Curated annotation (Swiss-Prot):
GO biological process, one term: cell migration
Compositional bias of kind Low complexity: 156-173, 225-238, 275-286
Positions on the Cytoplasmic side per record topology: 409-442
Positions bearing carbohydrate: 80, 82, 84, 91, 108-110, 160-162, 169-171, 314, 367
Name of the protein described by the UniProt record: Syndecan-3
Pfam families on file: Syndecan
Site (Cleavage of ectodomain): residue numbering on this chain: K383, E384
PTM sites of type Phosphotyrosine: Y409, Y419, Y431, Y441
Tissue: Expressed in the nervous system, the adrenal gland, and the spleen.
Ranges facing Extracellular side: 1-387
Entry GO MF terms: identical protein binding
Modifications made to the protein after synthesis: O-glycosylated within the Thr/Ser-rich region which could interact with lectin domains on other molecules.
Gene giving rise to this polypeptide: SDC3
Transmembrane parts of this sequence: 388-408
Amino acid sequence: MKPGPPHRAGAAHGAGAGAGAAAGPGARGLLLPPLLLLLLAGRAAGAQRWRSENFERPVDLEGSGDDDSFPDDELDDLYSGSGSGYFEQESGIETAMRFSPDVALAVSTTPAVLPTTNIQPVGTPFEELPSERPTLEPATSPLVVTEVPEEPSQRATTVSTTMATTAATSTGDPTVATVPATVATATPSTPAAPPFTATTAVIRTTGVRRLLPLPLTTVATARATTPEAPSPPTTAAVLDTEAPTPRLVSTATSRPRALPRPATTQEPDIPERSTLPLGTTAPGPTEVAQTPTPETFLTTIRDEPEVPVSGGPSGDFELPEEETTQPDTANEVVAVGGAAAKASSPPGTLPKGARPGPGLLDNAIDSGSSAAQLPQKSILERKEVLVAVIVGGVVGALFAAFLVTLLIYRMKKKDEGSYTLEEPKQASVTYQKPDKQEEFYA
């Protein structure tokens, strides 16, 4: 028979008495001592708790605990105002004394140890996280290997067709044809992953835009296209097809940037031109292939992606337009071949002819000059200002005339003799020398 809790000690004693009567006087003698100990322990614990609750409730003289509007029974559960006494801890100790004879104490120690054992496996997943990171890196490498054969198929189709179709689009970007030399170096992209820019352009030119959201596939495309292109002209043609269609941020030339800012219709105009002069634009990429130098093109690409970072999210129209005009001149200098000059002419003509556009440089300069000149003209032309000037002049003239009249009046008063300017009269009593000098001698 297991010893029950202290509050059930009476029932346990009754059960023990029944068992003792059944077992005999010998068993009764063995059971009575532990039962008596349990009864004494239970009564002592209950009496101590009752005494602590009713009589020995600590009073905090310095705190404001007694000022609360709670009854005395609830004040035992509340904290003291000054924080000097922790009565809940004392009550917890007393409850622990009640349950001290129970075996629950051993059980309570085991769950206290369990969280420590659980903490160790919690630490293991954090250790597994770095293990997952190396797994991601090899995951990218097999993707590159698997997608390399996929790109050649697209590459083969582009090399056969883009020598005319994609090279035709090079009219919009002849300088981008120079990018192939830099693709091997994994050149710029706004997210600081250099190969992404050129690779995104490659996917768009091939028409497979569904692969754009996967950065791993784009990395594979960049690596696959660069080794497979032994001849620079073919790669130049492929990249020419890729450059006109990109988001204008990945392209290394600023001409596509100038295209969307004046009007978005320029982008469809480029593919139309590409379809029309297929044979004429095909020699364009070959000429670009004759002049590819990786160092010079790296410099041009580094200069240009910095501008698209500011140009892509730019909300201001005036500043990005200034930037577009400067890179247009740079592109014209770098461009090689007649197709390049032809491509540079339409964007140049568009901003010139796009004077009606709201955000062009010409309009901005005119607005600034007008802002500086209009206020001056308006001040002189306003009737209110003229009336104010006239009235002020009249009032000033009247005031001056009034002052002059006052001065003249004062002068006239002096001349009329408002106060007499007479010669001073001799004093009535004057000192006269005696006629005779009389000397008196004492």
